Amino acid sequence: MFLLPLPAAARVAVRHLSVKRLWAPGPAAADMTKGLVLGIYSKEKEEDEPQFTSAGENFNKLVSGKLREILNISGPPLKAGKTRTFYGLHEDFPSVVVVGLGKKTAGIDEQENWHEGKENIRAAVAAGCRQIQDLEIPSVEVDPCGDAQAAAEGAVLGLYEYDDLKQKRKVVVSAKLHGSEDQEAWQRGVLFASGQNLARRLMETPANEMTPTKFAEIVEENLKSASIKTDVFIRPKSWIEEQEMGSFLSVAKGSEEPPVFLEIHYKGSPNASEPPLVFVGKGITFDSGGISIKAAANMDLMRADMGGAATICSAIVSAAKLDLPINIVGLAPLCENMPSGKANKPGDVVRARNGKTIQVDNTDAEGRLILADALCYAHTFNPKVIINAATLTGAMDIALGSGATGVFTNSSWLWNKLFEASIETGDRVWRMPLFEHYTRQVIDCQLADVNNIGKYRSAGACTAAAFLKEFVTHPKWAHLDIAGVMTNKDEVPYLRKGMAGRPTRTLIEFLFRFSQDSA
């Protein structure tokens, strides 16, 4: 008999089917170490029967229609993201999870600003793979569900959980494509998702483990193993001083951990002299707030205040693995923001690399201080584009929550490229204003050229972006405030609770499309 998760009435119905085992019993009968995830679509019309995917239909034929029979009596039709698990259907796959994919016709939703079909696949496959993981089965084959890249992303993202420091860990499940078609798209999805998982790991690791130096070493290890077309420079404090990065150093001086300026190069273009794209990421490996100290509640989350550095570095590692034919430079000023006798004090004035002076009225607005020097340095590479990412402001979380990354940019062309990439990945972005209205609030300063918090509490994300703009002269620059998407509670179904690693896949997709446009 089949072992089904059914109510009593349905179990009676199954017995009436007189279903027999499809293979001979015995020690060699079934490989209990492999599961299968198959997709089924919702009905387009009420009178229709739900359709399996191609892979689901083929498997149903392989078991003489039994999958359809038991699915029909096991409960109502599966809604998007829901699962049902069956056992004993085929000796190659003793455990089969059927997942609901929603409507087959689902496409780009202009109201939601994403591809609904791809998001449904990611969520459904993640749910199915977790069912296999809960059964402690170490291998799963996944139906491409009509989009092998989205299926791979759902599997790899959905199975990931940070448990590096625990003695008891979840079973590691290896996911691979069911069938031989679409292998290229599947592998691309694995790379995209693995990039986001790298960012999640960097962000989740406790701050005593993930120091500025350790962060740089992990990125170096991952980048060097990704491609031989790479260079990594872990710049010490003496180099930072030589570069006259006084704004960065003012934040770092409060901690016993030495600051590091991480500079990574991926040289994928056949033309070595081709100008690069430059990514800059905020790298505060722990943010106490400094002298303007934060409240104790949830301060532990500030181990992920280097999320900007984590996402941009992970995106570049992924670009290297994809062997994209472009040049990219990644810059990450790395330090802690701690209170001490050496720390910044409210009212201090510091000097940035471009000579501008900054009045530090709040030491908890430190991310913009380290980014100011990094953005100045970014211009030395004659870049095609400058994009920075930072968990910069709580105001961004209040404005957009976890729904989208806020993007402030001086280039509509760049905005459109990021927006298009985000529709594909489902990791959305939303354009925010860079009005002169906000610039006036940060340059109206009593003691220096600019103030690090501005005149008013209102529009904190906008005034922070206006502050950064004071250190940018490039006509194609975008600032991504990722504070609202730093963590995941239950908003993204294919990510477990914890640090989200967003918007890594959107940055990878942006680079992927840019490389195709440049070819």
UniProtKB/Swiss-Prot annotation:
Mg(2+) binds at residues 287, 364, 366. This is Cytosol aminopeptidase. Gene3D superfamilies: Leucine Aminopeptidase, subunit E, domain 1, Zn peptidases. It catalyses: Release of an N-terminal amino acid, Xaa-|-Yaa-, in which Xaa is preferably Leu, but may be other amino acids including Pro although not Arg or Lys, and Yaa may be Pro. Amino acid amides and methyl esters are also readily hydrolyzed, but rates on arylamides are exceedingly low; an S-substituted L-cysteinylglycine + H2O = an S-substituted L-cysteine + glycine; L-cysteinylglycine + H2O = L-cysteine + glycine; S-benzyl-L-cysteinylglycine + H2O = S-benzyl-L-cysteine + glycine. Keywords: Acetylation, Aminopeptidase, Cobalt, Cytoplasm, Dipeptidase, Hydrolase, Magnesium, Manganese, Metal-binding, Phosphoprotein, Protease, Zinc. Substrate binds at residues 282, 287, 292, 294, 305, 364. One of its GO terms (molecular function) is manganese ion binding. One of its GO terms (cellular component) is cytoplasm. It comes from Bos taurus (Bovine). Zn(2+) 3 binds at residues 202-203, 205, 303. Homohexamer. The keyword Metal-binding applies. The modification N6-succinyllysine is found at residues 45, 61, 103, 455, 476, 489. The modification Phosphoserine is found at residues 42, 54, 180, 194, 238. Zofenoprilat inhibits Cys-Gly hydrolysis activity. The modification N6-acetyllysine is found at residues 455, 489. InterPro entries: Leucine_aapep/pepB, Macro_dom-like, Peptidase_M17_C, Peptidase_M17_leu_NH2_pept, Peptidase_M17_N. The lineage of its organism: Eukaryota, Metazoa, Chordata, Craniata, Vertebrata.
